[in-house]
Amino acid sequence: IWSVAPLAREFEIPALIHADDRYRLADPAGSSMAAAREQLLAMTKNSLELTEPDDVQLLPPGRDAEIELVGIRFAVRHAPGHTEGSAVFQAERGDDVDVLFSGDVLFQGSIGRTDLPGGSPDQMNESLRDVIWPMTDEIVVLPGHGPHTTIGQERASNPFLQAAGSRRDAHAPNRGW
């Protein structure tokens, strides 16, 4: 998020963000305290531009939305936990394998931190259980950083996703007659 303003300006594109995270465009630490801002700037040798881009478009409200960017349809799912407005974007590619841009929600073998301002372990667990777990195994996951993976690989090996899946199964209605 720290590079959004310069990228949006350079490529003349809007910044898409969930309404719950809009404040982070100018305040990525989630705090308006001067000391936190100064620490962020010092850590990055004053290379951050902590400002909102000129063109900010809020993602449609609600848990699910569909948008089209450069001719590609995306299913957008609100997936709070790392931040209040975390979202994942699933590129729907027809006969090809779908791709999930997971941001800081899901990584290979891990998940986004929930101990930072705006994070919530409970919301992350719900997002993993209700948004990520039901996805098909073949979906390629491109996280905000780190190596790519697939939903199937994470379902088989990611302890956070496995725990969320077991909670989902425990809450499933008993269909036995």
Predicted feature residues:
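Residues at secondary-structure transition points
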Residues: W2, D20, G118-G119
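Conserved beta-strand scaffold positions in the cores of enzyme catalytic domains, especially
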Residues: A15, V56-L58, I132, V141
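Short active-site-adjacent helix-start/loop capping segments
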Residues: I1-W2, R24-A26, T150-I151
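Generic beta-sheet signal
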Residues: L16-A19, G144
